[in-house]
């Protein structure tokens, strides 16, 4: 369980800070921002092949997409970069069609080559990805054509679609150009928010990606996560209205925040920030 507090609409962050409300990107988000107090430091980079820190992992839920993703509040799977439900060809073969019109934040289209590359770099032992353990049932990944990818499994696996959520699709052309270290520091994805900047012990800044055509577009134009590991600092920021929402509310501060007309909720966290 996790306690979080917010003021009015600032608490409407079911999921990870409010992107998970299905509606089209619209002009009415212009000028809307979210400032939130986060309890975890920036402990790793953002490359989804290697990122394991709580804050960058949560940030990646906005920056990147998998073929299938899990809604962070309900944990229900939904089609992200997959345009159709995964098609089972036989007991150990699955095919997935890519979502039409998906683009990365640099404007380049998301391709099947990017999908194959994203899985292969995680499966490559040389990369020592933590996430390979979640897809160790996959034998190979290959392109069928420019819209479809095929997965061959080592054995039948009932949770195939759910495990796809562990792999986020990255732009091969960007990593080839700038290298893994630069990509780790300044990620480029296809999700509803673009990465703007990150400063250790300060904040992570995002902005809405207007061309995003997936299920859950951004509902605000800009989002800033203030990295406030100290609980007293988070509470002070919330009370002073520097932030609209905070997570991990200290138990001893609950009554005081409620007396100041703050909404405080206790929710199942699933180990995520702002569940």
Model feature map: region roles:
Residues 34, 115, 147-149, 239-248:
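Alpha-to-beta junction loops
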Residues 84-128, 150, 237:
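Aromatic- and charge-enriched surface segment that lines or borders ligand/interaction sites
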Residues 71-76, 164-218, 222-224, 230-232, ...:
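Gly/Pro-rich hinge or "lid" segments in bacterial periplasmic/extracellular proteins
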Residues 97, 131-175:
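Surface-exposed binding/hinge segments that line
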Residues 16-39:
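C-terminal segment of N-terminal export signals and the immediately downstream linker at the start
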Residues 1-20:
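N-terminal export signals
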Residues 37-90, 120, 188:
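N-terminal lobe/hinge region of extracytoplasmic solute-binding protein
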